[in-house]
Amino acid sequence: MGRKWANIKEKKASKDKTNSRIYAKFGIEIYVAAKSGDPDPHANQKLRFVIERAKTYNVPKHIIDRAIEKAKGTGDETYSELRYEGFGPNGSMIIVDALTNNVNRTASDVRAAYSKNGGNMGVSGSVAYMFDNTAIFGVEGKDADELLELLMEVDIDVRDILDEDGQAIIYAEPEDFHKVQEGLKAAGIEEFTVAEIEMIPQNDIQLSGEDLEKFEKLIDALEDLEDVQKVYHNVELED
């Protein structure tokens, strides 16, 4: 297992600077998920996944409901899911996931963010092979041993369960996200501090001085882009 969730949180904290930005990004993601299938989350697994994620970020119910209602309308606004891979200073690797209604605009914006901040865009696959796509759940009130026993009782295998930062973190295969979540809910666990599918780096690197400063500016520039939903990287950031 690469970087633990305790370290990943430090990366995520830089992205989640304002509630308004979180809500806006989830609003689009929920709209797209609802528009691409049934607007009922019980009948749309993708929509249900996004809503569960939104709840861990305390996205208000009216934001979720508004996005779903918009998807029920007659508008035909089309969004594309895009992934960009690239490099920052001194061996740092970055993956950018975007959701956009204008592919050319997003590609140009991402490319400019890289070039203006000392980074370089890579080709598809140039970085992703150094990351593991992983389902992650955070549960408070139970330790790793208790969760392992619960999951064994419902015959669900996971990659690992670790006690981290006052909570138990479950790492599972991404395709098992819903199975693990439903198994936990069947065992009486309804609330999650984390419910994500993340790209976890297989190995972390540390940056310092000017390299770290350049890297942080690059990440900020990417995360500030309207169409960017998630940014993953392999740099270990301090608390």
UniProtKB/Swiss-Prot annotation:
The keyword Calcium does not apply. SUPFAM superfamilies: YebC-like (SSF75625). One of its GO terms (cellular component) is cytosol. Gene3D superfamilies: 1.10.10.200, 3.30.70.980. It is found in: Cytoplasm. The keyword Transcription applies. GO terms for biological process: regulation of DNA-templated transcription. Keywords: Cytoplasm, DNA-binding, Transcription, Transcription regulation. GO terms for molecular function: DNA binding. Belongs to the TACO1 family. YeeN subfamily. NCBIfam families: PRK00110.1 (NF001030), PRK12378.1 (NF009044), YebC/PmpR family DNA-binding transcriptional regulator (TIGR01033). This is Probable transcriptional regulatory protein LMOf2365_0385. The lineage of its organism: Bacteria, Bacillati, Bacillota, Bacilli, Bacillales.
